[in-house]
Amino acid sequence: MYRARIRGIYATALTKLALDWGFKVVQPTEKIARRFGLEPDFSPPDITVKDHESKTGIVAMGLCEAVEAFLSKLTEYADPIVARARARLKEVFVGRAVGEATVEGPGGEVFDVPRRYVLTPGATGIYTVVRPPIGPLKGVAAPEIVVEGQYVELNTTGRVSYSEHIPAEEAVRLRILAETRLRQYASIGLRFKSSARYAPDDAIAAEAEALYKEMLEISKGGSPGQVLRRGKCFAVVLFDSASKARLDEARAAVVPTVRGHHALRAQGLGKCLDLLDHVGGDVYEKAAEFLAGEAAAVYHVKPWGEVVKMRAEPVGVRGGVLVLRRRLRPGGVLDGIGVKIERGFYALTCVPRGKGYVVHTYYTAEGKAVGTYVNANTVPEWGRRVIYIDLLVDKAFDGGGERVLDLDEYEKYAEMFPQRLRDPLSRLPKTPIWCTEEGIKTVA
């Protein structure tokens, strides 16, 4: 039985599912413990699940067997988009510097190195993965040794630090421990993890001693590309509207839940959503349209979790299409269209309800359309944040005709998508279209 710590806006649904799947939920919040009648269990987790920054998904990290077991069950239930990191978080390896700020690790993977470190090209050293590579995003590795346990982490930074989730009164206890029994480790580098707040001093001290011995062994190094210590598996899981609907069903089995609960929670709604849950009623579309009247941003989420945030001003809703206006910064070239962005250029973005695409038409300062870019994506969710997940294939329309873009990128990352989302071209319009202030128009 794997131990899972679950946090965030999906916590009720995922806790319900995790318990059904045979996981033991540890360190629950008071609200979750009360809802499920859980007995206090402050054991360190095998897997931690928390919100992704976009609030349209989660990140899962921990013991690889536990992470894979959780992802397997979640995929079966909610059919989400899943991106797995190519290297493990806190993995320690022998790397060879291939530039002033890059290092080559196991399997030829190249990591960025923070600029505060000075590298000598060609030199080898010991590195730790501090941000794993995922999708096209490079990982980040630091020339430090980090040895992580359940309660503490020993490192070579020379600092003592504490998880942000450790309350002030517990931090005082741990600070005293660092200055007494753990003094020799604190001088090297020591970080107290969130589970340390629940652990007795003896358990923390015993773990620190074992980690120190392991650190000494690791410091002997090895050959370039060698992994000296395995880290934690890491994955990004994104929920489109269909996956969120399944999570709504799971939550509804525990507490009153309106349709669209998780989509509205991703919009940042708090107490008013709790009220809607208890009052009941099918109000999702009306609530989403109301929030869209003050739309402030477009969240264009890549399947590996990267979020492109674009500020937008609402123009209005036109026949089931939300129209937004975005200012463009001069300089650069419009993707897929090849027109240089001049001062005063702007974009009108049309977000049709229930469709698998978003339309961006670009205009000069005088209001002349210069081209349209259509993204294939999951069905967009309306609100103060317009949220959708990029399916990586696009179409561009301009005076030169129509072009399909980025098919090669989609094919490279197709395995991240569930089968139901693996035909992005079918979601795109077959004829040229434009986004105008009156909505989407077909070009004759």
Swiss-Prot record:
Top-level division of the source organism's lineage: Archaea
Family (UniProt): Belongs to the FAU-1 family.
EC numbers on record: 3.1.26.-
Role noted for this protein: Probable RNase involved in rRNA stability through maturation and/or degradation of precursor rRNAs. Binds to RNA in loop regions with AU-rich sequences.
Name of the coding gene: fau-1
Record keywords: Endonuclease, Hydrolase, Nuclease, RNA-binding, rRNA processing
SUPFAM superfamilies: FomD-like
Organism: Pyrobaculum arsenaticum (strain DSM 13514 / JCM 11321 / PZ6)
InterPro entries, sorted: DUF402 (IPR007295), FomD-like_sf (IPR035930), Ntdp-like (IPR050212), RNA-bd_FAU-1 (IPR016730)
GO BP terms: rRNA processing
Residue intervals passing through the bilayer: none
GO molecular function: mRNA 3'-UTR AU-rich region binding; RNA endonuclease activity, producing 5'-phosphomonoesters
Protein known as: Probable ribonuclease FAU-1
EC top class, as a word: hydrolase
